[in-house]
Amino acid sequence: MATERLNQVRTSVFQASQSLLQTLSTSLGPRGLDKMVVKDKKTVVTNDGATILKYLNHHPIHGILSSMSATQDEECGDGTTSVVILAGCLLESISSLLERNVHPSVICDNLEIAKKIGLRYIDRVKMECSEKDLISNVTTALCSKIASSTGEMAVEAIRGMEYVNGDKKNIRVVKKIGGNLDDVKAYKSILLECDLKDIPKKAKVGVIQFCLSAPKTNMDSKILINDPALMEKIIQDERKYILEMCKKIKKSGCTLLVVQKSILRESLSDLASHFLKQLNILVVNSVDRKDVDYICSAMNIQPVSEVDLLSPASLVDVETGEVEGMLEIKGYGCTILLRGCDDMVVEEAERSLNDALCVVKCLKELPFLVPGGGSIEMGIALMLSESTEGNIYVLREIAKAFEGVPYFLARNAGLYPVEIVSELRSELKQNCCAGISVRSGHAGDMVRDDSVVQPAKVSISVVTLALETVSMILKIDDILPARR
């Protein structure tokens, strides 16, 4: 009975992983196709593995593979589809081993050996990365994305990372509808939406987290007015209350006010806006909490929660200007402005930009690159098939799984996959930089001829995550429903 249940669970796991492999395999590589995902009346068009998996949770195994892809996305930005395809191919090979009564413990031990062999191979073929190689790396990461036709995003991503000394968290992305993807640009400044009339060249910036509007009663409270004269008095009191707040802001010396968005009431009333305009104070209204945190971090100031706490000490002197119809605070942080014809294009462009930024970050942390075009996976497959370290039979099955990545890469490019994989296998024995060239339709030198390279950290992460995740899945013997 227990054996029957175990077989049912394993069959379910392998079938779920194979369905996911079939879905994602067509999105691999520069000629990979996009997926249209529809959920809750929201439509997303993307070929990013992590984004697709975010919407697919039909089986518990999908959640595990989704977490693996999300980790790859967070660590490296690139390789989110490759890691899932490699894991799927490994599970397919392992299922045939289990059918031949190979014990899971033996397979897990050999997966660990395969990981060591794979990392050793990457260490052997990696090359030092120079500043000139940055463009090639970022372009390779973007070749399957919506921004593949333009080199502007790669250039601006590198420029943006230079502005913040390689710290991706200090880059803010602003999306605007209109224009095209070529209009992407990195600014060494903070860009904010506001009324652009009479922008001063210099300003004193203050950030507030309180509302400039009349105070509200509690949700269940009511105000009953019996005398019409009291209505006028309430209006005058509200006017006086807001005017006093505006005068205190003016007294502090603030000339540019950033107001955080409120979910309870309007952050800036029409009356407050009128008074501040009369006092020559420029207002940036309804700024999101995360943007307020970014502004404060970039400018090294503290947001003020009460009007009485606003003082000259809480302000910062800045130079301002106008860029693309937005207020520019010069010299602080970094903003990358993305443009596109509609929301769907801009969202996908943002995901592409994130990949580009992560690739630059990877190369700053580990300045080594490896050839692309399935070269690493095929090279590891050759090493495993020739290795005598573990169980030769198991290692050869794992080697077949690694050949899956160049196979799907060739198939998606419209080539004959079996023929190309065989050609790549023979080429790699003579040249460790050989890979599948989508341009020529044959195996060629990825570094010299095609300039298709990727950070070594991406390949290290793909191999490590895929093998460790498969090893964990292999140890599952039952799926238990949890209490809701």
Curated annotation (Swiss-Prot):
InterPro entries: Chaperone_TCP-1, Cpn60/GroEL/TCP-1, GroEL-like_apical_dom_sf, GROEL-like_equatorial_sf, TCP-1-like_intermed_sf
Superkingdom: Eukaryota
Cystine crosslinks: none
Cell compartments where the protein resides: Cytoplasm
UniProt GO molecular function: ATP binding; ATP-dependent protein folding chaperone
Pfam families: Cpn60_TCP1 (PF00118)
Swiss-Prot/TrEMBL keywords: ATP-binding, Chaperone, Cytoplasm, Nucleotide-binding
Oligomeric and partner information: Component of the T-complex protein 1 (TCP1) complex.
Function statement: Molecular chaperone; assists the folding of proteins upon ATP hydrolysis.
Family: Belongs to the TCP-1 chaperonin family.
Protein name: T-complex protein 1 subunit delta
Gene name as annotated: CCT4
